[in-house]
Curated annotation (Swiss-Prot):
This is Neuropeptide-like protein 29. GO terms for biological process: defense response to bacterium; defense response to fungus; killing of cells of another organism; neuropeptide signaling pathway. Disulfide bonds: none annotated. Induction: Upon D.coniospora and S.marcescens infection. Upon physical injury and osmotic stress. Transcriptionally regulated by the transcription factor sta-2 upon activation of the innate immune response to molting and injury to the adult epidermis. It is found in: Secreted. The lineage of its organism: Eukaryota, Metazoa, Ecdysozoa, Nematoda, Chromadorea.
Amino acid sequence: MISTSSILVLVVLLACFMAASAQWGYGGYGRGYGGYGGYGRGMYGGYGRGMYGGYGRGMYGGYGRGMYGGWGK
């Protein structure tokens, strides 16, 4: 059974995906993988160049240039 919250999240992601497609010309990738409602060059709501909500250049919530929450490079 798909919950209402899951449907809402999918709808929001779809809307952001379409907005990114219109802005960058290609859904999801555009400028440095900047789709899915990402801010700047982030993905999945990431801020800056991070992925999955990461801040800066980190991945998966990493802060700075680290990966998987790493700090530093």
